[in-house]
Regions:
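Cysteine-nucleophile active-site neighborhood
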Residues: 56-128
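Amide-donor transfer/coupling interface in amidating biosynthetic enzymes
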Residues: 1-7, 44, 79, 112-139
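Structural motif
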Residues: 51-53
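N-terminal beta1-alpha1 ligand-phosphate binding loop
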Residues: 11-33
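An anion/phosphate-binding loop that grips the pyrophosphate of nucleotide cofactors and donors
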Residues: 47
């Protein structure tokens, strides 16, 4: 399979004390990519691509992003149009809000990340149907 992807790309893996950095770094290593693991805004803004991992609660993750002054650099990077990936909680943080503590998130995608209903197996893995309520530039 051919790809136009360059392994020389500068990928910043955002370190904000709420991410599964080791597993993401290891996964990238299988593709022979060594990310820059950093909580420095300059490393985010100068990256070719950014990955925002996440484990835990949206409330504590947003507090950590705020404390490390990473909210605006992440928003600026996303609006630049360069590749950005949120993994697990990192993806949920792109929403306007999370129902965990009714926390304001990054506001890149309109909506609220909701708790799964009781009785649903967690972690919830598998295929689901995604319904787009309105057009958005990332879809």
């Amino acid at each position: 399979m051919k790809t136009s992807f360059s392994r020389d790309i500068k990928i910043t893996l955002v370190d904000y004390d709420s991410g599964n950095l080791r597993s993401v770094t290891q996964a990238l290593g299988f593709a022979q990519i060594k990310p820059i693991v950093s909580g420095n805004p300059a490393d985010i803004l100068s990256a070719d691509a950014v990955i925002l991992p996440g484990v835990g609660s949206g409330n504590s993750a947003m507090q950590a992003l705020r404390r490390k002054q990473l909210i605006e650099p992440i928003r600026e990077f996303i609006t630049s149009g360069r590749p950005f990936m949120g993994i697990c909680l990192g993806l949920q943080l792109l929403m306007d809000f999370t129902s965990e503590g009714e926390t304001e998130c990054l506001g890149v995608v309109s909506g609220t990340a909701e708790h799964l209903p009781s009785g649903v197996k967690v972690p919830h893995m598998g295929w689901n149907t995604v319904k787009i309520a309105q057009p958005h530039f990332i879809f």
